[in-house]
Amino acid sequence: MPSEILNKARAYEAKHGAAISPAERPAYHMTPYVGWLNDPNGFSYYKGKYHQFYQYNPYDVRWAPMHWGHAVSTDLLHWEYLPCALAPDSPADNGPGCFSGSATQMDDGKQLLMYTSVIAEKQPNGEMRDIQTQSIAIGDGLDYEKPACNPVLTQKDLPEGFSKFDFRDPKIWREADGTYSVVTVCLAEDGSGAAALFQSKDGFDWHFVTVLERCNNQYGKMWECPDFFPLDGKQVLMLGPMEMLPKGEFHNGHNVIAFIGNYDEATHTFTKENVQLMDGGIDFYATQTTLAPDGRRIMTAWLQTWSDTEDKPKGCKWFGQTICPRELHIKDGRIVQAPVRELDAVHGKRTFHENVTVQGETSLEGIKGRVADLTVTVQPGEYRSFTLKLAADADHHTSLTYDPYTSELTLDRSYAGSRADIVHIRSCKVRSQNGALKLRILLDKNSIEVFANDGEQTMTAWIYTPQSADGIAFAADGEATVTVEQFELNL
């Protein structure tokens, strides 16, 4: 039976979430039913639908003791809200709550959720600290029960010297023989992150297997939101480092990076060959993947970052959204990303302009809007820079500028409408092709997702611009030749 705390959350969201009209939400990005969303959790395919749970505070548009919100979809674009799945209502999690986790299917057809359970505990010096453990909940896709054995993983299961204060974000899966495996992140004895592997025969009784990878203070400090999966003949360990220093393609603060390498299942040894940044934009964190029934590896993420969560639209009834899910592949040793192909199925009216010469600034007939799938191809040329302005009017725009001499693509939302002192500009390197560049851009009211050169690089950002600012403009220093294709979306 649902607890009083869970029933209260369900009643609140049913009343207040239903009062938010579809027009107040993005067209094809998932938002919380009401209130606050951060990390997507439990991204999975179960009983014929994609399930996306999420870190959730239904009562306000800011972080507070965590619940798990819940939504399902058949196409990864249209999301149906289900009742709140988890609340901080058990002895293992009745402090800051039910933190991030994941989902898998059990042999009896039930769905197993594994999450970080957090309680506040008084330390010998009198200080209150949050203790992080891992717990489970078992259900039918709608209601979930927490067994009395929780928590199922605690500090005693970690190697000596690892912290009980930073031990979180379990990502669970089933091996071919039915074994349950889970990777978590934890703070090692050197004060930096590590990814630890545990296994279980039944999902209840777990044992430590190995440390898959250590930060060694090379990639930030503490790690978050790990994932470990095979992809196109390689093995990927994806996670979110905190407190990164800018170096190469990595930027300050929270990043999402992927180690690409090989995994020996017999010895549980992961050998990395390459590491890359997963998104060069501003708002992208807390990734999680699932395997679709057709074999695609699909990734979701929080379309936000912690540094700008206080910059909210005035009077908003919800805050936080997830990205349009992306298909992952490996090309030339790196992960490339593409919007899920389900987006193609909702393409509507097509507007096409071929081999247009751009000198100075111009706009093109029919190319405008805040909900669209836009592709801009710039041909090789002698131009000195090319700029695309999105969500534009006389006072606002967000720009993408390409410098062919440095192969640098810059996303700038300085004029998007925010009044806060947050990050507005990010740049990333794209593959040099003598000035050639292909950009696919997903627009959805308050978000922009950019896929450069068929997803070799991506850049993601939340924008704060009035919806009336729907212009799109093209500008070049010199002479650039572009082909533009835009699809309206029938959602």
Describe the function of each predicted region.
Residues M1-D169, R174-Q218, P230-D279, L303-H353, ...:
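Beta-rich carbohydrate-recognition and catalytic domains
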Residues R10-K15, I260-L491:
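Beta-rich accessory regions
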Residues F229-P230, E479:
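Juxtamembrane/interface motifs at transmembrane-helix termini
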